[in-house]
Design a protein with these regions (language model features):
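Small-molecule kinase domains that catalyze NTP-dependent phosphoryl transfer to phosphate-bearing small molecules
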Residues: 152-189
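Cys/His-rich microdomains that often coordinate metals
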Residues: 9-12, 34
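Conserved substrate/cofactor phosphate-moiety recognition/catalytic segment
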Residues: 56-98
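Conserved glycine(s) of the Walker
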Residues: 51
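Short cysteine-rich clusters marking metal-coordination/redox-active sites
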Residues: 5-8, 27-30
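Hydrophobic anchor at the beta1->P-loop junction of P-loop NTPases
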Residues: 44
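Short linker/helix segments within small regulatory modules
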Residues: 15-25
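Conserved phosphate-donor/acceptor-positioning beta-strand/loop module used by diverse small-molecule
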Residues: 111, 125-148
């Protein structure tokens, strides 16, 4: 809905967003301007088993002024495109968040991701800021959690364990190097 220009009817995800208040979205085709809420997004990332679901469920009890979402609710095989760093999936989420923001509520989005995956999306321009919190834990604890999960989740397979341990390590080593930086939260205990 917000990608269609009320002035000329053109569809674009590349509207210019003004920096002055009130924020306006400007159609590149006809220069029509409309008011636009540009709110922050809070991304909670981490390897499987790092505590994202537990944190989300605990946060739900306090969620009156923000919306909590899990990125997995939109996942399907059509988004499985590692060759482009899952760009369509990430951009779809930013479009969803942009639309939710128009109701005046910021979003807390849970799911495994890196700042680069969101910051490089065209829909990123519509968000005032993205804050990244990375949940991490000690490798032995992460492995224990994944192995103890129900078998149907296939979390304890050797391949999955290695992928999650590697991602957890990457987050720990790179949180201060990403742009923007990620805040680390150790969930070991």
């Amino acid at each position: 809905m917000f990608n269609v220009c009320p002035g000329c009817g053109e569809y674009t995800d590349a509207k210019e967003i003004t920096s002055s208040l009130p924020v306006r979205a400007v159609c590149p085709a006809c220069k029509y301007e409309h008011r636009f809420l540009s709110l922050p997004l809070f991304v909670v990332t981490g390897a499987s088993g790092s505590g994202k679901t537990t944190a989300a469920l605990n946060l739900v009890e306090m969620a009156q002024d923000f919306v909590i979402l899990d990125q997995d609710i939109l996942w399907n095989d059509g988004f499985n495109a590692p060759e482009n760093d899952y760009r369509i999936f990430r951009n779809t989420w930013l479009r969803m968040v942009k639309n939710i923001h128009q109701a005046g509520k910021p979003v807390v989005l849970f799911g495994s991701a890196t700042p680069q995956q969101y910051e490089s999306c065209i829909e990123r321009r519509y968000l005032s800021h993205i804050h990244y919190l990375a949940l991490v834990c000690e490798s032995s604890e992460l492995e224990r959690r994944l192995v103890e999960r129900p078998h149907w989740r296939n979390s304890g397979s050797a391949e999955n364990l290695q992928k999650m341990l590697d991602f957890n390590k990457w987050l720990c080593e790179n949180a201060s190097r990403t742009e923007p930086k990620m805040t680390l939260l150790d969930t070991t205990k």
